[in-house]
């Protein structure tokens, strides 16, 4: 399902601290040997996430672009995605063989969604640390994303989150749409996410 004029564009959204940057890092490292990969990160007033990915050595620095959205970060991925579309166009010019571009949104709320003009597939990341009730609270990120990632499952015992309850609620809220439990520190769940992108993205 790559875009008509370029690479598969994968939007990665979720609240602050859910693990979006850690997921982006792990996906880049898992896919960079087989595919030509790049990243666009969104921050309100800095390029902190882009700089973090460079430090993590997710990809060479020329493949990572940070955009400063100002104001509300969800505007840059939904109502007016032009700043991100321009960043992708610039990457395409510099790296014409791109297969995949990950677009990491700024930390936002459960209502954040990507414009279909910007993302071909969307991943929404939540953390068990936000409470076991998060999946049943719903919102477009929970119910409409192509893949829901429930991250930091290793911390569930420490924050009183019941993974079985979260699994039940995610199944109910998402109907047939898939979700994955993950632990980015140990890389658990990454293989399933890569498989999802490969199959659903037509890579």
UniProtKB/Swiss-Prot annotation:
GO biological process, one term: urea catabolic process
Annotated Gene Ontology cellular component terms: cytoplasm
Entry-linked CDD domains: UreG (cd05540)
SUPFAM superfamilies referenced in this protein's UniProt entry, alphabetically: P-loop containing nucleoside triphosphate hydrolases
Gene3D superfamilies: P-loop containing nucleotide triphosphate hydrolases
Amino acids binding GTP: 14-21
A Pfam family reported for this protein in Swiss-Prot or TrEMBL: cobW
Top-level taxon of the source organism: Bacteria
Keywords on record: Chaperone, Cytoplasm, GTP-binding, Nickel insertion, Nucleotide-binding
Subcellular location: Cytoplasm
Gene Ontology terms for molecular function: GTP binding; GTPase activity; nickel cation binding
Protein function: Facilitates the functional incorporation of the urease nickel metallocenter. This process requires GTP hydrolysis, probably effectuated by UreG.
Family membership noted in the UniProt record: Belongs to the SIMIBI class G3E GTPase family. UreG subfamily.
Quaternary state and interactors: Homodimer. UreD, UreF and UreG form a complex that acts as a GTP-hydrolysis-dependent molecular chaperone, activating the urease apoprotein by helping to assemble the nickel containing metallocenter of UreC. The UreE protein probably delivers the nickel.
Name of the protein in question: Urease accessory protein UreG
């Amino acid at each position: 399902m790559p875009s008509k004029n370029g690479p598969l564009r994968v939007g990665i959204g979720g609240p602050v601290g859910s693990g979006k940057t850690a997921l982006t890092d792990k996906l880049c490292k898992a896919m960079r040997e087989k595919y030509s990969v790049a990243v666009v990160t969104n921050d309100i007033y800095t390029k902190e996430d882009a700089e973090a990915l460079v430090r993590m050595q997710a990809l060479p620095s020329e493949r990572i672009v940070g955009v400063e959205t100002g104001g509300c970060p969800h505007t840059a991925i939904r109502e007016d995605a032009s700043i991100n579309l321009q960043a992708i166009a610039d990457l395409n010019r510099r790296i014409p063989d791109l297969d995949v571009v990950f677009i990491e949104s700024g930390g936002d709320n459960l209502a954040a969604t990507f414009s279909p003009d910007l993302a071909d597939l969307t991943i929404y990341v939540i953390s068990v640390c936000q409470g076991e009730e998060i999946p049943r609270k719903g919102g477009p990120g929970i119910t409409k994303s192509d893949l829901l990632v429930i991250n930091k499952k290793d911390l569930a015992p420490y924050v009183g989150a019941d993974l079985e309850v979260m699994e039940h609620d995610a199944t109910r809220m998402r109907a047939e749409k898939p979700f994955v439990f993950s632990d980015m520190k140990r890389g658990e769940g990454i293989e399933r996410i890569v498989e999802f992108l490969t199959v659903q993205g037509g890579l």
